[in-house]
Amino acid sequence: MVQNNKLIILQPARDDIFDIANYHQSISGSSSALAIAREIKNALSLLKEFPLMGTVHDDSLLAKQGYRKFRINNSYACTYKVIENTVYVYTVTYNNKQKTGILN
């Protein structure tokens, strides 16, 4: 069943998206930066309708606290949590950096 939840991309995740876009701009130009930012935001918007499409976070401490991990594409993933009818996105990171710490 499709749900219609609220999606809140928290400031640390917004900063991550900005940093990712800046990185893409530095190596491939503005169109690449816009494309990756759009791809990430479009993927995150899927969580509004399908909040459990990500997996339980692979870090046991984060999993116990209800955090989930959603693979955006082959390079990036987000850490998020569903509280009632709201999806909170905490971080967007390079897949290999997704470790315990400050939710990244």
Placement of each model-derived feature along the sequence:
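Arg/Lys-rich, positively charged N-terminal/basic patches that mediate binding to nucleic acids
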Residues: 1-39
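Enriched for short, Lys/Arg-rich terminal
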Residues: 72-77, 81-104
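A short, surface-exposed loop/turn module that caps and links secondary-structure elements
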Residues: 45-71
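Substrate-binding strand-loop-helix patch
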Residues: 42
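Short, solvent-exposed coil/turn segments
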Residues: 2, 63-65, 73, 82
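A short linear boundary/processing microfeature
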Residues: 23-26, 53, 95
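Residue-level signal for well-ordered alpha-helical scaffold segments within enzymatic catalytic domains
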Residues: 19-22, 46, 81, 91
